[in-house]
Swiss-Prot record:
This is Dihydroorotase. Zn(2+) 2 binds at residues 152, 179, 232. The active site is at residue 305. GO terms for molecular function: allantoinase activity; dihydroorotase activity; zinc ion binding. Pathway: Pyrimidine metabolism; UMP biosynthesis via de novo pathway; (S)-dihydroorotate from bicarbonate: step 3/3. Its EC number is 3.5.2.3. Catalyzes the reversible cyclization of carbamoyl aspartate to dihydroorotate.
Length: 438
């Protein structure tokens, strides 16, 4: 329970209305005009949006095992900087998060850090090897209460194993989050397959490698009657398959990353490994289809796929470089530039695709709720009129492998509140936060 009190004055909500907010005891105690409270810290929100804390269903925090890239502490600091109050941590750690013990360790690390709620994602298969199911039930029954399972970074390519996983998690309303990539079609692939990959002499990554797995898995989900979530959709064909599945009544949800909403394969022409990512940057036609799919509800959410790497893993030849980009700090600005400034989505839509719906998919209570009296004090203040050149100084985690460095981005997170505590004030991540436990 928070013992900090804040009065936020003149904030604009997602529906366009203006209000003051009184935060105390870890909740939004009151909304209205000219609010005050003894001893409260007053935060002037004139011209700022007050939005529900963002929820990222797809984050790589790297701990345990890869602390040179990121830790739960540094990753959640990056999350707070981007307006996130809750993140789901992918399982590709060392040891892999395929047991109750490892997911409980990740949960405890998040509680100790205090910058955001951390919900571990459990591996689907032991060691992410795709050979036998991990301890799905034990992770679901653990203190971490895991409900999302993924081998992200690898595809559950065996259809029988995927069927069994869908059947297993159905018993406790879990969901399989599939990294849709047929490995036999993408062996050695380095960028999107097309004319440009031929010109650059880089092995191509065909769209059908993603689309074929999604087509298979939506049919499996329909057969089993279980929930399926598709990670980082990147092609127009994938949007078509998901749209067809939803029209058929299949229980499938899907995410798109900020970078796939903005960046295209042409950026690879300079062989700058900051633009090397899995799935790869695609054609402008794919970007347009992804934006349209998000706008019409075919794609349910935006998720960052925040993937930090040490400098040496990116500052090298393209073929040797690691796949992945950092994205927590820049996510909302990129989404604003892609679909808000272009008139495709409004701020109420942003609250839905970056907060309410990811919380619902992850079965997370107390997050993604509207900014209103009685709700948990999980929110952030955002200046949509700001514009700035994105720089490494804005990166609060360990990773500096951002594709947006030196780009002009819209908007800026001014303050973030988690469990009623401030984690960001005046645009800066606080060095210590009151919400830490353990």
């Amino acid at each position: 329970m928070s013992d900090e009190t804040f009065v936020i004055t003149g904030a604009m909500l997602a529906d366009g209305s203006r209000t003051d907010l009184l935060l105390a005891g870890g909740r939004i105690q009151e909304t209205g005009v000219r609010l005050s409270a003894a001893g409260a810290t007053v935060v002037d929100a004139d011209g700022l949006l007050a939005l529900p804390g963002l929820v990222d269903l797809h984050t790589h925090l790297r701990e345990p095992g890869y602390e040179q890239s990121e830790t739960v502490l540094t990753g959640t600091r990056a999350a707070a900087a981007g307006g996130f109050t809750e993140v789901f941590a992918m399982a590709n750690t060392s040891p892999v998060a395929d047991t109750a013990g490892v997911v409980e360790q990740v949960l405890s690390l998040g509680e100790a850090a205090g910058y955001a709620t951390v919900r571990p994602i459990g591996a689907v298969t032991v060691g992410l090897e795709g050979e036998r199911l991990a301890e799905l039930g034990a992770m679901a029954d653990s203190r971490a209460r895991v409900r999302v399972f993924s081998d992200d970074g690898k595809c559950v390519s065996d259809p029988l194993l995927m069927r069994r996983a869908l059947e297993y998690v159905k018993a406790f309303d879990g969901v399989i989050a599939q990294h849709a990539q047929e490995p036999r079609i993408t062996a050695g692939a380095q960028m999107n397959e097309g004319a440009l990959s031929g010109e650059l002499g880089l092995a191509g990554w065909p769209a059908v490698a993603e689309e074929s797995i999604i087509a298979r898995d939506v049919l499996l989900a329909e057969h089993v009657g279980s929930r399926l979530h598709v990670c980082h959709v990147s092609t127009a064909g994938s949007v078509d398959v998901i749209r067809w599945a939803k029209a058929r009544g299949i229980d499938v949800t899907a995410e798109v990353t900020p970078h796939h909403l903005l960046l295209t394969e042409e950026l690879v022409s300079g062989y700058d490994a900051r633009y090397k990512v899995n799935p790869p940057l695609r054609r402008s036609e794919d970007v347009e289809a992804l934006r349209a799919g998000l706008a019409d509800g075919t794609i349910d959410i935006v998720a960052t796929d925040h993937a930090p790497h040490p400098v040496e893993a990116k500052d090298c030849e393209w073929d040797a470089a690691a796949f992945g980009m950092v994205g927590l700090e820049s996510a909302l600005s990129v989404v604003q530039s892609s679909v808000v400034d272009t008139g495709m989505l409004g701020w109420a839509d942003i609250a839905r695709v970056l907060s309410a719906t990811p919380a619902r998919i992850g079965r997370l209570a107390g997050h993604g709720t509207p900014v209103e009296a009685g709700a948990p004090a999980e929110l952030f203040l955002y200046d949509p009129a700001a514009a700035r050149e994105f720089s490494t100084g804005e990166l609060a985690g360990k990773g500096v492998n951002s594709p947006y460095l030196s780009m002009t981005l819209s908007g800026r997170v001014v303050a973030t509140f988690h469990r009623g505590y401030a984690t960001v004030l005046d645009g800066a991540v606080l060095e210590s936060v009151g919400g830490a436990r353990g």
